């Protein structure tokens, strides 16, 4: 074969190889998990779960109801099934990602109007997309001994929300965007940051007395208030009566009990510079660790750690250490949908962590901290931007 023909053949092979590697549709044909396969995966998982089966009289009692996620959360990325007898299963839509992403043995899954849940799920979507660049199925990771820790907040019945009565002392919405007129005159949501932090404080029933006042000015970019808007919390004067700050609220509590939780929520929100809104609020985890120590007198062991500084194994070891010491973890990330903050308060021993989302128990369950294929992480590195700039506040104790 002469050099000219050999060169043409080599170029043809390289072009063909480039086409295969650069064409995600071709790759998806090999690795996509269709709806039937996803449902079968959910059924197989349920059959292996004694806790889920315990809620049914027989296997025939268990029915699956597909949750319509919509947008980027739908279709080829993941499937969510609510279980008729209680609980849910989240299945990846691609075989290059972990088959099961999350589950619960009770309740149901609902991300509608819950920005922190939608944002966390969106991080799964981005990670699954990253995995689609690979040409190998998910093989799992080396078995790492993980503690089994039952939900710490559940053990005390702690399930807070962002509306009434938790938000009775948050700022009142003064103006709105088009289509949001019903929010005018209503109290702002507590925000997932304040809700997560307050739940951890209730777990510890600490402090009995506030330490330091705090004031700040709302960002002039906030569209819901007239500016300047200054907020102040007289935290140093507070006596937090944890007998009146209940683990959860149904609306039938006394006014004293309602005001006790709303005061705590407002103090926490202000102490972290909450950017209040009618249905959500945002703040950074660096402010959480500062507020817990400086304003509420928590131990100086409280500090923030960032996912990007750790390998997957070392990051999960940090979380495991906290849970083994009966210390719930404040967890936060940022994605396209927005920020998300929640509490990690348990582990099942199989790399799933129990999440309390702060929506009164809705969608609480066990979730993977990421959906990345180990091959996408490289050697020894963190997860780059594919873990939604995750951070955690650890060492939270009186």
From Swiss-Prot:
Q: Where is the signal peptide?
A: 1-27
| Catalysed transformations (reactions) | Preferential cleavage with hydrophobic residues at P2, P1 and P1'
Description of the deletion phenotype = Cells lacking SpeB display a strongly decreased virulence. Cells lacking SpeB are unable to infect skin tissues in a humanized mouse model for impetigo.
PTM note: The mature protease is derived from the precursor sequence by cleavage, either in cis via an autocatalytic mechanism, or in trans by mature SpeB, host trypsin or host subtilisin. Maturation can involve a number of protein cleavage intermediates. Mature SpeB probably plays the most important role in protein maturation in physiological conditions.
Q: What are the start and end residues of every segment in region (C-terminal active site loop)?
A: 368-390
Q: Which InterPro entries match?
A: Papain-like_cys_pep_sf, Peptidase_C10, Spi_Prtas-inh, Streptopain_sf
Domain of life, source organism:
Bacteria
Active site positions: 192 (nucleophile), 340 (proton acceptor)
Residues bearing PTM Cysteine methyl disulfide: 192
The reply on keyword Transport is no
Give the result of residue 382 to A, as annotated. No effect on catalytic efficiency or substrate-binding. Decreased ability to mediate autocatalytic cleavage
Q: How is its activity regulated?
A: Synthesized as an inactive zymogen to protect the intracellular components of the bacteria from proteolytic activity during protein production. Once secreted into the extracellular milieu, cleaved into the active protease: maturation can be mediated in cis by autocatalytic cleavage, or in trans by mature SpeB, host trypsin (PRSS1) or host subtilisin. Protease activity is strongly inhibited by zinc and copper, which prevent its maturation into an active protease: inhibition by metal ions may be required to prevent proteolysis of streptococcal proteins.
Q: Tell me the Pfam families matching this sequence.
A: Inhibitor_I69, Peptidase_C10
One GO location term (cellular component): host cell cytosol
Q: Name one GO biological process term.
A: symbiont-induced defense-related programmed cell death
According to the UniProt entry, the note on domains is: The C-terminal active site loop is required for the recognition and recruitment of substrates and release of hydrolyzed products.
What is this protein's function? Answer: Cysteine protease that acts as a key streptococcal virulence factor by cleaving host proteins involved in immune response. Triggers inflammation by mediating cleavage of host proteins, which can both promote host pathogenesis by triggering sterile inflammation and/or restrict streptococcal infection, depending on host immune statue and infection site. Cleaves host gasdermin-A (GSDMA) in epithelial cells, promoting GSDMA activation and formation of gasdermin pores, triggering pyroptosis.
What family does the database annotate? Answer: Belongs to the peptidase C10 family.
Name this polypeptide is given: Streptopain
């Amino acid at each position: 074969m002469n050099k000219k023909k050999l060169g043409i053949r080599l170029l043809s092979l390289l072009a063909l190889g480039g086409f295969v590697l650069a064409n995600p549709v071709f790759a998806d044909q090999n690795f996509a998990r269709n709806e039937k396969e996803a449902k079968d995966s959910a059924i197989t998982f349920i059959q292996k779960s004694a806790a889920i089966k315990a809620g049914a009289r027989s296997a025939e009692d268990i029915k699956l109801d597909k949750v319509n996620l919509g947008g980027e959360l739908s279709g080829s990325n993941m499937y969510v099934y609510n279980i008729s007898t209680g609980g849910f299963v989240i299945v990846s839509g691609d075989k290059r990602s972990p088959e099961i992403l999350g589950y619960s043995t009770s309740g149901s899954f609902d991300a509608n109007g819950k920005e922190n849940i939608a944002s966390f799920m969106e991080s799964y979507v981005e990670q699954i997309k990253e995995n689609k660049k690979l040409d190998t199925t998910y093989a799992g990771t080396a078995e790492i001994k993980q503690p089994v820790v039952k939900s710490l907040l559940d053990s005390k019945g702690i399930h807070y929300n962002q509306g009434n009565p938790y938000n009775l002392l948050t700022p009142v919405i003064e103006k709105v965007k088009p289509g949001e007129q019903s929010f005018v005159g209503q109290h702002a949501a507590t925000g997932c940051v304040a809700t997560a932090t307050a739940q951890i404080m209730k777990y510890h029933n600490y402090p009995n007395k506030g330490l330091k006042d705090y004031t700040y000015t709302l960002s002039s970019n906030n569209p819901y208030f007239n500016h300047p808007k200054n907020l102040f919390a007289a935290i140093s004067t507070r006596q937090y009566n944890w007998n009146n700050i209940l683990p959860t609220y149904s609306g039938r509590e006394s006014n004293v009990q309602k005001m006790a939780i709303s005061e705590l929520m407002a103090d926490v929100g202000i102490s972290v510079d909450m950017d209040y809104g009618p249905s959500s609020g945002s703040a950074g985890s660096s402010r959480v660790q500062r507020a817990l120590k400086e304003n509420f007198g928590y131990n100086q062991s409280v500090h923030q750690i960032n996912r990007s500084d750790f390998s997957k194994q070392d990051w999960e070891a940090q979380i495991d250490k906290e849970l083994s010491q009966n210390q719930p973890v404040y967890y936060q990330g940022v994605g396209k949908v927005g920020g998300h903050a929640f509490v990690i308060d348990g582990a099942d021993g199989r790399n799933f962590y129990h999440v309390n989302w702060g929506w009164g128990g809705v969608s609480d369950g066990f979730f993977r901290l990421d959906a990345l294929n180990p091959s996408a992480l490289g050697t020894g590195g963190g997860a780059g931007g594919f873990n939604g700039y995750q951070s955690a506040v650890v060492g939270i104790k009186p």
